[in-house]
Amino acid sequence: MNRISTTTITTITITTGNGAG
């Protein structure tokens, strides 16, 4: 569960950074 959460957060961060950039 913790691993999935980390992956999700990472994906969201990348997506947000990509969209913001």
Curated annotation (Swiss-Prot):
Name of the protein: thr operon leader peptide
Keyword Amino-acid biosynthesis: yes
GO biological process: threonine biosynthetic process; transcriptional attenuation by ribosome
Highest taxon of the lineage: Bacteria
Family to which the UniProt record says this protein belongs: Belongs to the thr operon leader peptide family.
Pfam families: Leader_Thr
InterPro entries: Thr_lead_pept
Organism ancestry: Bacteria, Pseudomonadati, Pseudomonadota, Gammaproteobacteria, Enterobacterales
Presence of the UniProt keyword Transport in the record: no
Keyword field: Amino-acid biosynthesis, Leader peptide, Threonine biosynthesis
Record's function text: This protein is involved in control of the biosynthesis of threonine.
